[in-house]
């Protein structure tokens, strides 16, 4: 990583909830709504967007902690905006405040921490696990 991001730097992801983003265990008339795992996926990618311009070739990021409150349901067809704001950066570890809104209200708030890693070193460690 060239330099750590500045506190206040943001990343954003926008999407429209599709059927593939809806809970898959709905039955008995349960409406199709955005499921929490997909919401977290978009929130994590918003955080990554804040860091991408600072990565060197061969760098990537991995999530190390996430804490999300899914506050409100969002139906299929609604637009969602996920935003991550840097609240702390120390070395390769970066912490974010998360928030997501649909067209009507805040649907999620939380905290995420990621770490910038060297892909080659990460792959080597993984290979050792595979070879056991």
Name each model-derived stretch.
Residues 2-35:
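Catalytic strand-loop segment that frames the active site of acyl-thioester-processing enzymes
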Residues 6-12, 65, 79-81, 93-95, ...:
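Intrinsic-disorder/low-complexity, polar/charged segments enriched in Ser/Thr/Lys/Arg/Asp/Glu/Gln
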Residues 14-18, 69, 113-115:
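Generic structural detector for well-ordered beta-strands
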Residues 30, 34-38, 95, 117:
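Residues at secondary-structure transition points
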Residues 48-81:
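Hydrophobic beta-strand-centered segment that forms part of the acyl-chain substrate-binding groove
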Residues 75-76, 85-132:
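HotDog/MaoC-like acyl-thioester-processing domains
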């Amino acid at each position: 990583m060239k330099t750590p991001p500045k506190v206040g730097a943001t990343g954003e992801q926008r999407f429209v909830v599709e059927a593939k983003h809806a809970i898959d265990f709905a039955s008995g008339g349960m409406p199709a709504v955005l499921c929490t795992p997909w919401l977290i996926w978009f929130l994590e990618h918003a955080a990554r967007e804040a860091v991408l311009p600072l990565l060197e070739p061969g760098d990537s990021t991995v999530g190390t902690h996430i804490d999300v409150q899914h506050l409100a349901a969002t139906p299929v067809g609604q637009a969602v905006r996920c935003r991550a704001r840097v609240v702390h950066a120390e070395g390769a570890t970066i912490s974010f405040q998360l928030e997501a809104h649909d067209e009507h209200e805040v649907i999620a708030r939380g905290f995420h921490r990621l770490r910038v890693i060297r892909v080659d070193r990460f792959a080597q460690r993984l290979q050792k696990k595979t070879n056991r």
